[in-house]
Design a protein with these regions (language model features):
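NTP/phosphate- and nucleic-acid-binding module
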Residues: 1-42, 50, 56-594
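Conserved P-loop NTP-binding catalytic core
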Residues: 45
Length: 594
């Protein structure tokens, strides 16, 4: 595949750069198509992405419909067919600015001003379209073989919500049609697994703009799953000596100034509220409250480690473009805990947290994950607590512990919490990009800020170390992960309805009611479908919509024999005695079988 660089020389593309060049060129061709259809278009940035490309554009008052996006793609295909040569050129700063002024490219001009040290700028041109770019690109527009415009959304200029909201138009591009077809098949699978779609079908949760974007509400079925997850992780934690607490969802601004969140995390927080001369804010995380619980009384080294846990509601101001059902919202509940320990206990506490993470993953059959040691960017003094000695000590300590424990990990710069390094466990869901599910963070910073102490063996006061950790992450995100992994087919212990009783006709309704009552008495979550519908319809609804683990299809034969016909998710049918079936289901519930 031939590509052209900004100095004009043409060469074969390195294989690992092919897709990037294809997608970057696709962004330029899309921009050219937009400019032809909307001459007022003023372009911002248009990079290649992991699967495709996008361009942020100011269209003035113009709003785009799905039909408009289709027309842009149609125009792109015309440009490809025109087989326009793509040529680079370089201009000194003054001429480059003049060119952009003539073309009314206001965002490019502002970007050039940000690049104050640059004395010249490179451009690429195809036909009438010119874009400021360092390249490289395909040599002709016809070399773009397989692409598709996928969606539009909003994006702030320079990702700053104080700036103007632009229209972001996304697309995908691949080497050939076969790769595009494979991607579209993957997207169809993603749509079928999407937790928002399944959540709506199963009645798990809902959202409403009147309540607010990013503020999901759990319905009875969804809250049942949520409570089961809460019970599961609390049992695990209690067995390890965790002490569970409950703290308020708000705190004073001064609390977050003390912790450092106000300086380093304010852009992710909701605005402060003024009440009776004091400023309060919805909490974005729970560590300040837990620090205050520790500070509530004196501690001896004998009290440590002290493990404070909470299923805690938190609030973060996520931009509207990043919101995604219960996977990412502005309100969520963290499976949070803070472990206060001595320096000598760091290794054993990190080991215990890691063991709990991996034990939990085994319980849920989570196998596709990787461990990341997230470190600070030393050059970013604004984002991180400014104490080089503390950071070096904390990062080396966590690195050494993970190495000693034999945990394979990669390191990523700039991903630490503002107060300390962390181990992130990133999962690869059934569809989409990986994200962090579990975390364990080492903190020497907040205990000092809150003047936390314990009396050591020698009678002197010392500052404890704190481990911030979340095993399920947020229950909301973990539930979204499970929905997409299982397509809503939860294991029996987790299913909102574990058994659905389906009378074949009104003649067996009385027997069905008696069986339902017996299952309820056994502690099984059961629903009776007494609608006057054909049995085939009832089975499809239970299997495809409710996704129940077991259906009891009860006809005259079962009523006469006093047994049940059991139909599982695979469609396999077995006749069982009632007590035998109850024993089977209750065993699955008790053992939390998958």
């Amino acid at each position: 595949m031939k590509i052209i660089y900004k100095d004009g020389h043409v060469d074969e593309s390195p294989q690992d750069q092919e897709l990037h060049v294809i997608r970057h060129t696709a962004a330029h061709i899309m921009a050219q198509a937009i400019k032809r259809l909307y001459p007022q278009a003023d372009f911002a940035f248009g990079p290649a992405t992991e699967n495709g490309f996008y361009y942020d554009v100011d269209l003035g008052d113009q709003k785009l419909s799905d039909e408009d996006l289709a027309n842009i793609e149609k125009e792109m295909r015309k440009i490809v067919k025109e087989n326009l040569p793509i040529k680079p050129f370089i201009l000194p700063r003054a001429e480059a600015v003049k060119l952009m002024e003539e073309r009314k490219e206001n965002y490019k001009i502002e970007h050039m001003a940000d690049l104050a040290d640059e004395t010249e700028f490179s451009f690429f041109q195809q036909g009438e379209y010119v874009d400021m770019c360092i390249g490289p690109h395909l040599t002709y527009t016809k070399a773009l073989k397989a692409f598709k415009i996928t969606q539009q959304s909003g994006a702030y200029w320079k990702n700053d919500k104080e700036n103007k909201m632009l229209t972001r138009i996304n697309g995908v591009a691949f080497r050939n049609q076969e790769e595009l077809d494979a991607w579209e098949k993957e997207q169809q699978e993603a749509r079928e697994r999407d937790h928002r779609k399944i959540g709506k079908e199963m009645g798990l949760f809902m959202t409403d703009d009147l309540v607010g974007r990013g503020l999901p509400m759990f319905l009875p079925a969804g809250y049942t799953v949520w409570q089961e997850l809460e019970n599961y992780i609390k049992e695990k934690e209690r067995a390890r000596g965790y002490l569970h607490v409950m703290t308020p969802c708000i705190g004073t601004v001064n609390l977050y100034k003390t912790s450092g969140h106000w300086d380093h995390y304010r852009e992710n927080m909701f605005p402060a509220m003024e009440m009776e001369g004091e400023s309060y804010v919805l909490r974005p995380m729970n560590c300040p409250h837990h620090m205050m619980i520790y500070a509530n009384r004196p501690h001896s080294y004998r009290d440590l480690p002290m493990r404070i846990g909470e299923i805690a509601p938190d609030f973060r101001y996520e931009s509207s473009g990043t919101l995604k059902g219960i996977e990412r919202g502005r309100h969520f509940c963290q499976n949070d805990a803070h472990l206060f320990c001595t320096p000598e206990q760091i290794k054993s506490e990190v080991a215990d947290v890691c063991n709990l993470i991996f034990e939990t993953y085994k319980d849920f059959n989570i196998t596709d994950y990787r461990c990341v040691l997230s470190l600070r960017d030393p050059a970013d003094k604004k984002k991180y607590h400014d104490d080089d000695a503390m950071w070096n000590h904390a990062e080396n300590a966590l690195r050494e512990v993970l190495t000693e424990l034999g945990i394979h990990f990669t390191e990523e710069i700039g991903e630490a919490a503002f107060y300390g390094p962390k181990l992130d466990v990133n999962v690869k869901p059934a569809v989409g990009a990986e994200y962090t599910l579990s975390t364990c963070q080492l903190d020497f910073c907040l205990p000092a800020k809150f003047h936390l102490t314990y009396v050591d063996k020698d009678g002197t006061e010392k500052t404890p170390v704190v481990l911030h950790r979340a095993i399920l992450g947020s229950l909301d995100r973990f539930m979204a992960y499970l929905i997409e992994e299982t397509k809503g087919k939860f294991p029996t212990w987790l299913a909102p309805v574990q058994v659905k009783v389906l009378p074949v006709s009104e003649k067996t309704l009385e027997y069905s009611e008696a069986i339902t009552e017996k299952l309820v008495e056994a502690g099984i979550r059961v629903a009776l479908d007494d609608d006057n519908q054909k049995i085939g319809y009832k089975i499809r609804a239970a299997q495809q919509v409710d996704r129940v683990p077991y259906m009891l299809v009860l006809g005259a034969k079962e009523a006469e024999a006093g047994n049940v016909s059991v139909r599982d998710r695979k469609g396999e049918t077995t006749t069982m005695e009632v007590d035998e079936f109850i024993a089977k289901v209750t065993s699955e519930i008790k053992n939390r079988s998958l």
